[in-house]
Structure formats: C-alpha cells, structure tokens
Design a protein with these regions (language model features):
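Substrate-binding clefts and catalytic carboxylate motifs of secreted carbohydrate-active enzymes
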Residues: 1-84
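Intrinsically disordered, low-complexity Pro/Gly/Ser/Thr-rich segments with frequent PxxP/GP/PP motifs
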Residues: 85-123
C-alpha cells in the first residue's frame, strides 16, 4: 500500500504542474539490487507491486485528483484532444454514512492541461 500511495502521488504532482514547472520525471532506484519492500517499481524477481498500479492510476489519460498542498480538485487531460463540458463531482460522507459535502462543476479541458475545478469545503 505504501508503494502504491508514494508513486501515485509522485505522478499526480507531475500531472498537477503539467508543463508549468515540470516537464519530466526521474525515478531513482527503480530496479532493486536486493529484495526490498519499498521504493522499487518491481520486485527483485520481476513481479509487479503497488507501484505499478499506483503509477497506472495516476497516469490515466483523463484523471481527477485531489491536490493536498492546495486542497484543490484538478482535472488532468493527458490526451491530444479537447474535452468541453467535463463534469467533476465530489461527495464526502462521514462515518455514519451521512453526506456532509457535495459539489459539482462543469469545466472545459484543453489538450495536455490540468484544470482547477474547485476547492472542496471540507468540514
């Protein structure tokens, strides 16, 4: 789970700053020299682990993500097509399964851009 979250965040930060301050990404120690449980893209016997799935999720061509440093919801378009009228919806429930927040917006997304959708009002 740790590998999944770490690498998903690495790629989501890259998406969030798409073409602004980031234009590439370097993964250090992607090949493990000996068996390990963290910071590797695959195991010493070439089996995929959480890194593969976290990276794949973050690198979806069309991806919605929460940016924890700014508390914004972003729509990422990593395709060569424009997508007008993309609807982004967020719902938050408490532990008693009561909906405590709901918001929906419609945004236009140009090719290869990240669009700030809204800031959720987290209670």
């Amino acid at each position: 789970m740790l590998n999944y979250e770490i690498y998903r965040e690495i790629f989501e930060v890259w998406n969030y700053r798409l073409w602004n301050t980031f234009s590439g990404l370097l993964l250090w120690m992607s090949h493990p020299a000996w068996p390990s449980t963290v910071w590797q893209t695959y195991s010493s016997d070439y089996e995929t682990n959480g890194v593969f799935y976290g990276s794949r999720k973050a690198c979806e061509p069309l991806h919605i993500q929460f940016q924890p440093d700014t508390y914004n919801i972003y729509f990422i378009n990593n395709t060569l097509n424009d997508y007008p009228g993309i609807r982004t919806e967020l719902k938050i429930w408490d532990l008693d399964a009561r909906e405590i927040f709901s918001k929906s917006t419609v945004n236009d997304s140009k090719a290869n851009t990240s669009v700030k959708c809204f800031v959720p009002e987290i209670p």
